[in-house]
Amino acid sequence: MLSVEYLKELYPLVYNKGIMCGSFAPDEWDGIILELSERISKYLELNPNPQFAVDQIKEKYGGLRFYINCIDDEIEGYIREAELAVDEIERRLKLL
């Protein structure tokens, strides 16, 4: 599992306020969370939002839940793509 400190170091625009309610996700999802964080960071560089914060990253019902404190269609799209990628990983793991 990725630490909040590590995420803050890599993506300060995304995690500058930490993760309000914590992060609880399986290690197998680290790559997807890092890719999502990278995409959000690049977006925030071009579209600054000083109020942006990640509220929580967790597993729920076998899927990724990545909660943020604001509504942004572009970022929400990135999150949906990451959730689908996790669903695919979980589907493949069940086939093994």
Name each region found by the language model.
Residues 1-77:
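Long, charged N-terminal interaction/targeting segments
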